[in-house]
Each structure stands twice: as structure tokens, then as C-alpha cells.
Regions:
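Sensory/regulatory domains in signal-transduction proteins
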Residues: 1-126
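Sensory coupling linkers of modular signal transduction proteins
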Residues: 96-156, 163-164
Length: 165
């Protein structure tokens, strides 16, 4: 596992199709990718298979609704290691205010936040395996929404509460 320092901020930008248009040095250092290896590639190049597809469905639904997304995510490095982050993804607007892409800032998370996310994601992954590939994202997202409703919080509230020290 690659551990982020408290002051590490991983920054990346993508176009509307999710292709990387910018990464900062911290992104390159933590992910072990050189800039030329990721520019123009889909941002899911760092997606770890332990994060359910339903979480990414929620992220895209949230962004398409014009809102920012917060989530604890496990990412994959170029050499097969992983790192956990608190991700904040927002719309990236051009000078005229039109959405031109997406802007993501990721930072370190506590072991407690990782534990909570891991437990949630394990159940979502179990549901995705049972649902089959095509139905997997919707099935696990439905379960996630139900689990959050039982706790009377949104996924964002759950995420941010789990990240408080």
C-alpha cells in the first residue's frame, strides 16, 4: 500500500469524456505514472477493482446533476500497488461557464474511513457479482442508497463523517 502524507494533494483534470488533460506531480509520484503515460487516457486507468461500479455510477450521476462528488476511493498504481484517498470531484467550467470537464482533488484518509468504505464496498461487490455485469452498477447503487437511507444520511454525509478526525 502507498500511504499519502497528510499534506499530499493529488490533482487531475479530465475532458468531458473522462480523458486526462492534467495531472500534478503528486499524482505522478503516488500513482507511479509518468505524465506522458496518462495524458489522453481514461481516468479509470487508476480505478481499483475493489471499488464497486455502483460507486462510480453514483459519482457520474452526481456530476451530471451539477453537484460535486465526495467519496473514499481505492486507486491502483502503475506498478500494481494501491492507495486510498478522499476524492472530491467537481465540474470544470470554461471562461463562458460551460462545463469543459472535471476537476479532482484527492487527499489522505484515516484508517477508520478506509475500514468503513471497505465494509460498504465488500457488500456492494457481492451484490454486483450476483447481479451480473450489465445490472451490477444499478444493483449495488440501489443497495447503497438503501443503506444510506437506513442511516438517514447521504453518501456524501457518510463519507465526510467517516473522514473526520
Amino acid at each position: 500500500e502507498v500511504r499519502l502524507q497528510e499534506n499530499d494533494l493529488i490533482v487531475s483534470k479530465t475532458d468531458m469524456k473522462g480523458r486526462i488533460t492534467y495531472v500534478n506531480r503528486t499524482f505522478m509520484r503516488i500513482s507511479n505514472y509518468a505524465e506522458h503515460e496518462v495524458m489522453g487516457k481514461q481516468h479509470n486507468v487508476v480505478r481499483h477493482p475493489d471499488v464497486p461500479r455502483g460507486v462510480y455510477r453514483l459519482m457520474w450521476d452526481t456530476l451530471k446533476a451539477g453537484n460535486e462528488f465526495f467519496g473514499v476511493l481505492k486507486n491502483l498504481t502503475a506498478d500494481g500497488h494501491f492507495y486510498w484517498v478522499l476524492a472530491n470531484v467537481t465540474l470544470d467550467r470554461n471562461a463562458t461557464g460551460e462545463v469543459a470537464g472535471y476537476f479532482s482533488v484527492r487527499r489522505s484518509v484515516s484508517p477508520d474511513a478506509v475500514r468503513e468504505a471497505s465494509d460498504l464496498y465488500a457488500e456492494m461487490l457481492r451484490i454486483e457479482r450476483q447481479a451480473g455485469s450489465a445490472a451490477a452498477p444499478e444493483a449495488s447503487l440501489a443497495w447503497l442508497k438503501s443503506a444510506m437511507a437506513e442511516r438517514m444520511v447521504s453518501f456524501e454525509q457518510f463519507t465526510l463523517a467517516s473522514c473526520r478526525d
